[in-house]
């Protein structure tokens, strides 16, 4: 069954199941889904991203921990939450990442909130910001010039994930509270571009 939701259909397609291993009831989406609970699912247990990049959320309404979902198969919840610091076995809402463009992505990171202090320009993946010369383990604010990025709490793309997009907040993320409802710290130690 293909469901059309509020955003216009693009080149995104995701199929979700209510049981692990691509078993049980399934639904196919080409646009955002604010709550699988409304479909009778308790949570998504497995999924396949057929096209586009998506971000999944722990709770309905695009709240809670964020999980980047790129093209591929995810037979169980640990396949998409394996590198997070506090894996949650719930995924109840998801949406496409419209501006993901791996080839043309640019991000400015700032030492302090509100775009103050030392800054760094990024256009590549960095498994360790400290290895590239960034002092400390915190980033105060971000400006996304183009593309979409996932920032991780720890080196090696581990820990909480924060999805930053050029078409959200006009690309401006002045404070960690704008990174997502689960963000509680400025700690960011690795950054990568989201693949379309």
Curated annotation (Swiss-Prot):
Residues 99-104 are annotated as: Connecting peptide. The modification N-acetylthreonine is found at residue 2. It holds the Pfam family Crystall. Transmembrane segments: none annotated. Residues 2-11 are annotated as: N-terminal arm. One of its GO terms (molecular function) is structural constituent of eye lens. InterPro entries: Beta/Gamma-Crystallin, Beta/gamma_crystallin, G_crystallin-like. Residues 12-51, 52-98, 105-146, 147-195 form the Beta/gamma crystallin 'Greek key' domain. GO terms for biological process: lens development in camera-type eye; visual perception. Keywords: Acetylation, Eye lens protein, Repeat. PANTHER family: BETA-CRYSTALLIN A4, BETA/GAMMA CRYSTALLIN. Has a two-domain beta-structure, folded into four very similar Greek key motifs. Homo/heterodimer, or complexes of higher-order. The structure of beta-crystallin oligomers seems to be stabilized through interactions between the N-terminal arms. Belongs to the beta/gamma-crystallin family. Crystallins are the dominant structural components of the vertebrate eye lens. This is Beta-crystallin A4. It comes from Canis lupus familiaris. The lineage of its organism: Eukaryota, Metazoa, Chordata, Craniata, Vertebrata. The gene is CRYBA4.
């Amino acid at each position: 069954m293909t469901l059309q939701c509020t955003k216009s259909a693009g080149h995104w397609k995701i199929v979700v199941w209510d049981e692990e291993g691509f078993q049980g009831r399934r639904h196919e989406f080409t646009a955002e889904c604010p709550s699988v609970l409304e479909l009778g699912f308790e949570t998504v247990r497995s999924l396949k991203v057929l096209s586009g990049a998506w971000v999944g959320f722990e709770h309905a309404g695009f709240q809670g921990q964020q999980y980047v979902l790129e093209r591929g198969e995810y037979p169980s919840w640990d396949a998409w939450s394996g590198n997070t610091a506090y894996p949650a076995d719930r995924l109840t809402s998801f949406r496409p990442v419209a501006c993901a463009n791996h080839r043309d992505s640019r991000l400015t990171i700032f030492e302090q909130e509100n775009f103050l202090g030392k800054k760094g320009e990024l256009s590549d993946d960095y498994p360790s910001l400290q290895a590239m010369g960034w002092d400390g383990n915190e980033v105060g604010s971000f400006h996304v010039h183009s593309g979409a990025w996932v920032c991780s709490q720890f080196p090696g793309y581990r820990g909480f994930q924060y999805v930053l997009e050029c078409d959200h907040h006009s690309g401006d993320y002045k404070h960690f509270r704008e990174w997502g409802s689960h963000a509680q710290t400025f700690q960011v130690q690795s950054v990568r571009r989201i693949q379309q």
